[in-house]
């Protein structure tokens, strides 16, 4: 039989090996503890970015609450050993209210708080999440929720924004022009994955629908858009539209670029289009970079 009372939680813990804490000699009061991170001497190099990543936190994107995955960083001078990383979460909490609403303005406010709280000259953030939006079937006009992946990137140095980026990843349908040309019947098609990274002019005024503008350039130039709900009239429309608009991966990336290059608030962009080939075991892809 056990020497402990197994009808109690504490007894079971002791039965499985738990012991009393020791009487330590090190301080237990914060003010008396050694703060190694705040050590000041010559540590040879300054650090451009140091912080935390893979922080999952509730965010709000266009009225939908979702999970955001964050990477926060600040600079670190040559004379400081380290940063107090707990202050990063404290800075985020100051702007949290049942979900941090994702916008460049809100993220900039968080970064300025972080700069001051960490007593550093610069700070940066990258945050990814699901963007949900209403999507209506093309003929029957039935509403459902579509989604795309978005990543905001922002950096500040003092009062200046030094980096402003938005990445959108969405899926579309692409129909093969070669297959259509050589086949007696129909053509093979597949799902295409498009990733667009926009480099935004920090001094420019963004339109309120900037995410929709980017998504439209991606989807409108594909063979067809993807829809959550399709009834038979919708499926007929989608199938025929794809056949009317065949796209090689090379065609798609150039057409998207032609739309994005017209945006006066963009300094440049990176695009990758990847087709998950339906008649091969490999994918097809194309990449394009453009700077104004």
From Swiss-Prot:
Pfam families per record: GCHY-1 (PF02649)
Alphabetical keyword list: Hydrolase
One Gene Ontology biological process: tetrahydrofolate biosynthetic process
Entry GO MF terms: GTP cyclohydrolase I activity
Disulphide connectivity of cysteines: none
Catalyzed chemical reaction(s): GTP + H2O = 7,8-dihydroneopterin 3'-triphosphate + formate + H(+)
Site (May be catalytically important) residue list: 176
Record flagged with keyword Hydrolase: yes
Biological or metabolic pathway of the protein: Cofactor biosynthesis; 7,8-dihydroneopterin triphosphate biosynthesis; 7,8-dihydroneopterin triphosphate from GTP: step 1/1
Catalytic class of the enzyme: hydrolase
EC number: 3.5.4.16
Similarity-based family: Belongs to the GTP cyclohydrolase IV family.
HAMAP family: GTP_cyclohydrol_B
Function recorded in the entry: Converts GTP to 7,8-dihydroneopterin triphosphate.
Protein name: GTP cyclohydrolase FolE2
Gene for this chain: folE2
């Amino acid at each position: 039989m056990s020497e402990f009372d197994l009808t109690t939680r504490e007894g079971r813990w002791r039965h499985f090996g738990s012991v009393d804490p020791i009487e330590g000699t090190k301080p237990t009061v914060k003010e008396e503890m050694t703060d190694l991170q705040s050590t000041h001497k010559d540590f040879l190099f300054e650090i451009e970015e140091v912080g935390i990543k893979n922080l999952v936190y509730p965010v709000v994107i266009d009225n939908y609450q979702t999970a955001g995955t964050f990477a926060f960083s600040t600079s670190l001078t040559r004379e400081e050993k380290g940063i107090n990383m707990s202050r990063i979460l404290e800075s985020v909490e100051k702007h949290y209210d049942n979900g941090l609403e994702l916008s460049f303005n809100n993220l900039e406010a968080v970064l300025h708080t972080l700069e001051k709280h960490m007593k550093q000259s610069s700070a940066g953030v990258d945050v990814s999440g699901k963007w949900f939006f209403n999507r209506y079937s093309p003929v029957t006009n039935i509403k459902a929720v579509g989604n795309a992946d978005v990543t905001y990137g922002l950096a500040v140095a003092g009062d200046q924004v030094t980096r402003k980026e938005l990445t959108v990843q969405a899926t579309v349908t692409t129909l093969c022009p070669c297959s259509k040309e050589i086949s007696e019947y129909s053509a093979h098609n597949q799902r295409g994955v498009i990733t667009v990274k926009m480099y935004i002019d920090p001094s420019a005024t963004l339109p309120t629908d900037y995410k929709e503008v980017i998504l439209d350039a991606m989807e409108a130039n594909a063979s067809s858009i993807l829809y959550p709900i399709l009834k038979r009239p919708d499926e007929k429309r989608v199938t025929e539209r794809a056949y009317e608009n065949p796209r090689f991966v090379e065609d798609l990336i150039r057409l998207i670029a032609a739309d994005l290059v017209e945006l006066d608030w963009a300094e440049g962009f990176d695009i990758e289009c990847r087709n998950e080939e339906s008649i091969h075991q490999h994918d097809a892809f194309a990449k394009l970079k453009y700077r104004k």
